[in-house]
């Protein structure tokens, strides 16, 4: 393969990666609803340079929701918002506006006087109708910004009636009423204008912001000093890199101990920095994580500090979800990480920017903050329980053992009565309509004294089911639990005062009558219910009846149907939890006129073996055909748990399809009737949940109908590249939970097919390895440079990069690709010899924690080679253009001369002085790149002039130094490959200059960091080539350094990319020695 054909392969690989990114991004539809608010930012002018010199650059503001919260004084509980990289202080307006609406539209204060709330607010009381009007249509005298969404500007009158009603009158989620808030105070949201600082690229900027915020918190708390029961801490919300700033605050000397005890982060990369181009940001991450790891233990400085990390999941194309995990530095007693797909009433993936404005998420966040704000003085366990209640799906506790007849769960006996009604018992309890004559499959008939609370009306229906030893109880319903009593009961053994309560129990008809006198003790297990989305009984793309009335297009894709469906509840109690109980009792108190015909309750007892399916295909078995199928047993339970122990890599995405084994498609089964062997319609469509313990991620996929034509995507969040593992934890596989209507299944079995999603996997590959595409080309270039130097030492001919690429592709690349396949198998101890500071395995090369994706190494190197080819072509065009400009200006070609003239010494001394005092060394690096580009272009002038002499048939008057042309071109490519590492810091400096902030960036003003590069550029641009030294030791030393440089780039360059600049300085010193 020669240079003429290889670029086609390389460029094709690049195009596929870019295509995969676009395809992956477009396939995940944003289902967030727009948020609306009326913001008013009040500048806190009292916090100025007398408190901190950073006030020259930053400013503190108080948020108020116009026409909802009219007070301009603080009087609630303080919350501080920290924007992320390039973020705005206005990003808090969605959450803050929602919190204000939820608090001030609380029915308890609808008619309250203004002076009844904290510290004498001047807000005038409004009626509910006035509040609705002012919120929806604005106040023309006071509103300067109108109602805005965090996207396009939206006027107040553009809000639909449903939006206004939802904004004001919707009930709070999780069933928690406003009267249950522990502290009847609003929230005071403070936000900071950081001038859109770029914190992802510079560690110094992060520390500056953290210092400013510590002083700001001291000032905020001082505002409450005259209030009764003043707060002593602030809740901090950080978006993106704002979460790292919040965590950095507690590590600084300026931090007031206890002033922060709750931190909520949204899409924050906690484990690894987004890019590792800056030494400061890499070191800061290491120091902050170590501090949190050592200080969150009992007795540590942060033992009472709570950290909750929320990630948007697969839709976040900027920050991989795995980077938001906290288990590597935080014990479970002090926080957790959760994906938005798990949060009840959200249940969807959210992109990076939408995390602060997505209506479904901000509603839950605001409600949670209102509750937690009153618990800031409580123990960390109390606040942790609150966040877990609102943010976790509940599947984490399905295996939790129920408390046997605990006092808190018993029904009070004096409120119970005994009724003696005919009751059908079976292994299943099925309720899916409200006709009194509904029958279920019968095994035996009992006259059973069903317990019934006094408020239950006489129209209630009662069902009972015996508890089978060794079986688990499974209950799924979409009926409101406040209208159902789901009880587990046992015969009283004398540990409960029965007050003479008794009942009669009859045996089955075939065994005659047996009379006994006993008492029952029951526990209500509704508290064990897990909320989840309903799975509608309509085929994919069908219309939902209740939404057809809106006239909107309600075609429902598989992955987006969650936002359009109602809730369902699931209860699971294992055999140990049911130990000692004899009966499961369901009392249905629902009214037929208030419940739709699609309402159902399904309860059954099932053996663990009926619920568990373990599929353990190897990666080779999957890769051979790209898919594998799991046959589900015919006698399956309501829930089927499918374990995939080998599927843990975050780099592989799957699509899942559900089908039947016979001619009936799954689409037909969802609409199936009794003709399929059922005695009633299908209660619900199959519901799938993917669960990841690391991120507490429960990703639901509803309405799995449509057979092979439709599928749902599954992205695993387990073993991510370069991710350190928490102590005592290993990578685990994937778990899938499938709920199907077991009561209506026919004889055919179901099969679940997992197929590798090629485009989704390529998109994940690019998301994790975007830094790799900027680093690995340096490895390819160093290999090319070694080829050029090897030829030069034997022939004194410095070949072109095109010739070196031919040699590299034909002879070296196949061996390198073969060797890269074996790198995942190299022991960690051997790799650490290149960089002893590497602490954990899986942080070298591609950061793989296993060997099954060994082929990614060759793929990455092929793409890196293609990038070098493209850059080589582009620089050829650039230098030819520069050469043409020199020729048109009549400038002479480059001629070797001493680089140390007085003028040049003065110029370079002045530039170094600027680096030492004012500009970062990255600025001098950019100057070096420009000088090298001009030098490489000027080196070609002689070739252009010789070509003209040939056209004029005259003797050539210019001697062409082809060695110099190739040498300067190679040096230019070397500097261009370093641009991604140096450009971000330069952008930060220019941003600071634009905001008139002239504080030097620490660690970026080292003269030694740029001097070797400047000297080499100065010599090469003046026509001075490298020469063969008399001693071969210098050549051997240069080759040894190049080999080390190349291996470091390959093994550690992605995680420690900032070190490439230092190694390039070493290479420049070697070439400079050969030049002089």
Swiss-Prot record:
The active site is at 240. It is a multi-pass membrane protein. Glycans are attached at residues 48, 119, 404, 849, 952, 966. GO terms for cellular component: endoplasmic reticulum; endoplasmic reticulum membrane. Its main location: endoplasmic reticulum. Involved in inositol deacylation of GPI-anchored proteins which plays important roles in the quality control and ER-associated degradation of GPI-anchored proteins. This is GPI inositol-deacylase A.
